[in-house]
C-alpha cells in the first residue's frame, strides 16, 4: 500500500488471478465494496496504516488478514513493486501455517502510540543529560551519572559564583536545564496516561495481580 495508490490483486479459490487494479486512496474502499462480495478474504502487509484500513474493511463485512512484511518477501517472484507485492500477499495468505497479525483496535493503537512517544522522549532525555555532562566536564565540573543527581547538581552549578563558569555558559546551561525539565514533565504526563490505561484495561489489571509485577 502506497500513501495515495492501492494496488489490488484478486484471485479465486484456485488462486487464479481474476483482476489487477491500481486504485486511489479516495475510491478504493468504494470499488472493493461494489466489486468484491462481503465475507471475502482480503490480505494486506501489516505496514503503516494497515490496521486503520483493516478496520474499515471489516466494517464493510470483509475478512481481513494482516501479514508481516518478512513473511511476504519470500513470495515476491520478480522485481519489487506494488503489483508484485500485491500478488505475493495473495500467495502468502493462502499458505498453510501462515502467521497473521491481529488487527488492532483504536484503543490498542492509542496504547502503542503512547508507549512509542514515551520511549522516544526517554531517548531524548538521556541524550540531553549526556550533552550536559559532556559540556560541564569541559569546565572542570563532574556530572553525576544518575539523572536524579544531575537534576540536583544543575541549580547548584548555576548559583555557585566561584566555580569559574562564564555568564555566557551559565545562560546556556540554564537553557539546557529548562530543556531537561520540559522532557521530565512530558515523561510524567505520559506515565500518568499509562497508569490510567492500566487501570481501565482488563488485561493490565490481571497482570498487575501477578506476583512480582
Predicted feature locations:
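A detector of single, family-specific signature residues
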Residues: 1-213
Amino acid at each position: 500500500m502506497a500513501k495515495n495508490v492501492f494496488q489490488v490483486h484478486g484471485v479465486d479459490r484456485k488462486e487464479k488471478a481474476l483482476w489487477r487494479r491500481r486504485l486511489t486512496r479516495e475510491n478504493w474502499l468504494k470499488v472493493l465494496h461494489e466489486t468484491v462480495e462481503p465475507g471475502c478474504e482480503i490480505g494486506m502487509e501489516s505496514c503503516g496504516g494497515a490496521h486503520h484500513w483493516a478496520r474499515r474493511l471489516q466494517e464493510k463485512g470483509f475478512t481481513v488478514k494482516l501479514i508481516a512484511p518478512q513473511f511476504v518477501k519470500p513470495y515476491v517472484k520478480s522485481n519489487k513493486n506494488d503489483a508484485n507485492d500485491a500478488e505475493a500477499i495473495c500467495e502468502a495468505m493462502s499458505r498453510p501455517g501462515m502467521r497473521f497479525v491481529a488487527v488492532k483496535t483504536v484503543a490498542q493503537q492509542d496504547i502503542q502510540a503512547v508507549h512509542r512517544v514515551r520511549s522516544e522522549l526517554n531517548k531524548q532525555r538521556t541524550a540531553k543529560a549526556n550533552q550536559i555532562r559532556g559540556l560541564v566536564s569541559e569546565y572542570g565540573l563532574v556530572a553525576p551519572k544518575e539523572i536524579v543527581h544531575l537534576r540536583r547538581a544543575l541549580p547548584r552549578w548555576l548559583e555557585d559564583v566561584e566555580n569559574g563558569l562564564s555568564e555566557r555558559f551559565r545562560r546556556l546551561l540554564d537553557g539546557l536545564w529548562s530543556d531537561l525539565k520540559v522532557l521530565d514533565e512530558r515523561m510524567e504526563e505520559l506515565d500518568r496516561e499509562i497508569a490510567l490505561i492500566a487501570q481501565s484495561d482488563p488485561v493490565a489489571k490481571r497482570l498487575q495481580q501477578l506476583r512480582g509485577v
